[in-house]
Regions:
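Acidic/glycine-enriched connector segments
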Residues: 2-5, 10-160, 167, 171, ...
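Non-Sec secretion/translocation targeting segments of pathogen effectors
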Residues: 182-188
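C-terminal amphipathic helix plus adjacent low-complexity
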Residues: 177-180
Length: 188
């Protein structure tokens, strides 16, 4: 199984949301499993891309029925809370709800057992900055040497697509022809 984290800002631009949905749909057909957090924006776009394919996603929630989503993955463990605390610069200032939001990021990167790293992270943050809740996950990914592709690093959607497809080809070298074929159909 190949797991990837699909995360990002609630304020992700519409054209990036469409790209996220298309990429998630493609990755689901390649038997990749999305790990995400059920938030509005990027998380929802990734989920929408693979929701019609059985067992194509693991949605980690900070609490039951977050955003009216049902998932067997809710209520972060004490271990996830401790791990999240390590990566947040002002943990003691967070509310209990904010701590749970940060803790669910650990699962997006390391799975339900907190021991099975995602192969890569696809995300969006404004200008590619390591900020907000997504920034917490990105700091963890960097520490765990998980490759990151941030769709916010470029303003031109065509450059984003080109770099994204190159990134995906690096992640799936054995499927380069299939990725290229999908890229060409996506661009038209």
């Amino acid at each position: 199984m190949i797991y990837y984290a699909g995360i990002g800002s609630r304020d992700t631009p519409a054209e990036i949301l469409i790209l996220m949905e298309n990429v998630a749909k493609y990755l689901a057909t390649q038997h990749c499993i999305l790990r995400s957090g059920g938030a509005n924006g990027a998380d929802t776009a990734f989920y929408n891309g693979c929701k019609n394919i059985k067992n194509a996603s693991e949605i980690y929630l900070p609490w039951k029925n977050f955003n009216n989503i049902e998932s067997k993955y809710s209520e972060p463990s004490e271990a996830a809370m401790k791990l999240a605390m390590k990566y947040h610069p002002a943990w003691e200032k967070l509310s209990q709800g904010a701590k749970k939001l940060q803790a669910r990021n650990c699962y997006q990167l390391l799975g339900n057992d907190l021991k099975t790293p995602s192969k890569f992270v696809l995300c969006y943050t404004k200008e590619g900055k390591v900020i907000g809740g997504t920034g917490q996950a990105l700091r963890m990914a960097i520490d765990y040497n998980i490759p990151i592709f941030n769709m916010g690093e470029e303003r031109d959607i065509n450059i984003v697509k080109s770099k994204l497809w190159s990134f995906l080809k690096e992640q799936f070298p054995q499927q380069t022809k299939k990725v290229v074929k999908t890229i060409e159909s996506e661009r038209s």
